[in-house]
Regions:
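Active/ligand-binding-proximal structured segments within catalytic/core domains
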Residues: 22, 29-82, 154, 191, ...
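Charge-rich, well-structured scaffold segments of protease-associated domains
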Residues: 2, 12-14, 18, 29, ...
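Short loop/turn motifs at secondary-structure junctions and domain boundaries
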Residues: 6-9
Length: 421
């Protein structure tokens, strides 16, 4: 039995259908554009790996482009580029996405290509070793980029001995160990209908999308596999310092926070905007502009299904690391102990809402928003829903969330400093 629901408040029109096999189709119809963005989302990422599988979800994302039953590798990209379209993919901690952009007249082509990639890869043996070399070079590239490497070290500190603390790319040892059987086993047990979402935004009609998905997934009958994920374990703050042959020091100060299931998620977003959201933020004004200590400083909030973290990054001269840490912690302390002014709160709300609404000018952003929200909540939030949540946050709630997050004894710090420091 097929289940369909819709939210029609004028355009865009959101509709959602659950196919009999459990695969979900979500669309936003926007007739005023000529483009479409199509995504196939799999609710499986690096979090769903065993220690021996670390990096496997990402490696599969690479390998599907090497060929499917119906297409050789070079034909896959050519299929979209021939009509001026675009094809790509990415892997995160909790999901993998294969997506395409094209004109609305090429909807079937785009759906066909991304579903073919996700559901029918062949994983040619001769390509596996070559792609292992490619991914190993990708790992080296990140290892040579301290502003990226420090976040791997940060996540390992925030989520110790847990898949969320492992790098999405895996390690050279795990990547080199992957076999074709490993890839097929992961796909058979994670790329199942109950974990799949097809998300489409643009000048499309929902019923037409559903009909195409049904046609293109005929015979896709892998049995559903329950989503079982290890709960996050305990967190104990740590202070880690390492050195590399670099000229600038890199510092992250952060802590464990809450996941998307927590009602404080909107307050966290506003707090993040006040603290590190752009050149007018407190971090930028009170550290970069006031002291000239850095070029790059910002805050970040990572929110996963049932876990999250919040932190600050700063790139600074090696001789000023301790002073920079003190200045960052001072800003955190002020937010935790003092109520922000109504003017600052309203400015942050306006900034956050404006950023979200401008992002919705892009069909790709709309498609990605639907896919992520469906995987996380199995429902749809209208823009009015989101704005109401933002407008409902109070200054007291911002202070209370900051106080819960920024207790000094909860903060971890990770630094990568020059070897000569």
């Amino acid at each position: 039995m097929q289940l369909t629901s819709s939210v029609d408040l004028g355009y865009p029109v959101f509709e959602r259908t659950i196919l009999p096999n459990g695969l979900r189709v979500v669309t936003e119809q926007i007739p005023s554009v000529r483009s479409i963005s199509v995504g196939v989302w799999i609710g499986a990422g690096s979090r769903d790996e065993s220690p021996e599988e670390a990096g496997l979800a990402h490696f599969i994302e690479h390998m599907v482009f090497k060929g499917t039953t119906r297409r050789r590798g070079h034909h896959i990209a050519q299929r979209m580029e021939a009509v001026g379209g675009y094809l790509n993919a990415f892997t995160s901690k909790e999901y993998t996405c294969y997506y395409a952009r094209a004109l609305d007249e090429h909807l079937e082509r785009a759906l066909d290509v991304v579903l073919d990639l996700a559901l029918d890869p062949t994983f040619p043996e001769k390509e596996i070793e070559k792609e292992q070399d490619v991914v190993l070079e990708e790992i080296k590239m990140y290892a040579d980029a301290p502003e990226d490497l420090i976040f791997d070290q940060y996540e390992a500190t925030i989520y110790p001995d847990h898949p969320l603390g492992w790098p999405v790319l895996g390690t050279p040892e795990t990547v080199r160990s992957f076999t074709r059987a490993d890839l097929r086993q992961f796909v058979e047990t994670r790329y199942t209908p109950n974990r799949l979402v097809v998300s489409v935004a643009g000048n499309v009609e929902h019923d037409a999308v559903v009909a195409l998905v049904r046609k293109l997934t005929a015979g896709f009958d892998r049995p559903p596999v329950p989503v079982e994920r290890a709960p996050v374990n305990g967190y104990a703050p740590k202070h880690v310092v390492s050195s590399k042959p670099i000229q600038q020091a890199h510092l992250v100060v952060g802590t464990r926070a809450w996941g998307l299931e927590d009602e404080r998620r909107t307050t966290v977003s506003i707090l993040n905007t006040i603290l590190g959201g752009g050149m007018s933020s407190r971090l930028s004004q009170n550290i970069r502009e006031k002291y000239g200590y850095c070029y790059s400083v910002y805050s970040f909030a990572n929110m996963l299904a049932d876990a999250g973290d919040f932190g600050v990054y700063i790139g600074v001269d090696a001789g000023k690391v301790d002073r920079a840490r003190h200045l960052v912690e001072r800003e955190l302390h002020k937010l935790a102990t003092r109520r922000v002014s109504d003017r600052m709160l309203n400015r942050a709300k306006t900034q956050l809402k404006g950023s979200m609404m401008l992002g919705l000018e892009s069909m790709s952003n709309r498609m990605m928003r639907m896919g992520k929200v469906e995987l996380a909540f199995e429902r749809y939030f209208t823009l009015d829903d989101v704005i109401a949540h933002v407008d409902g946050v109070t200054a007291d709630e911002v202070r209370d969330v900051a106080a819960a997050l920024f207790e000094t004894e909860r903060l971890s710090s990770i630094a990568i400093v020059p070897e000569s420091a």
